[in-house]
A protein has these predicted regions:
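Short, cationic-aromatic polyanion-contact patches
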Residues: 4-7, 58-77
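Pre-recognition alpha-helix immediately N-terminal to the DNA-recognition helix
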Residues: 9-14, 25, 92
Length: 122
């Protein structure tokens, strides 16, 4: 899996939210000013080449849908971030966020509860 550019990620967020759609649908969900159709069409084709989306053809019309789940990409990006900036240590990454984002005890307690739930489900 490859990391996406900012524009690719923005378009991918729209595709994940919509579940499927045409290029014009994706443009509709993007913030103003709306980018040109040709730009978003190119980005979607790049996303397809990168393996993030696929399409069904209905004549000349293509309906695109995500192939990679949002959670899978999120996990990939966070692991990549931990590798690049925190020597691969999730603990160092979490410590950084706890310090920099000024997480309180309540927030930390909720995070610990989430981790315990995830471990119980494994």
């Amino acid at each position: 899996m490859k990391e996406l550019t900012k524009v690719e990620e923005e378009v991918m967020q729209v595709i994940w939210n919509r579940k499927k759609g045409l290029v014009r649908d994706f443009i509709e969900d993007l913030p103003d000013p709306k980018p040109p159709y040709s730009t978003i069409s190119s980005v979607v084709r790049i996303l397809e080449k990168k393996g993030f989306v696929n399409h069904k053809a209905y004549g000349k019309t293509h309906e695109y849908f995500p192939v990679i789940a949002k959670d899978d990409y999120r996990k990939f990006v966070l692991n990549s971030l931990a590798e690049r900036f925190f020597s691969g240590s999730p603990r160092a990454l979490m410590s950084f966020f706890a310090r920099e984002e000024k997480l309180g005890l309540k927030d930390m307690s909720e995070i610990i509860s989430e981790i315990k739930k995830a471990e119980d489900n494994d």
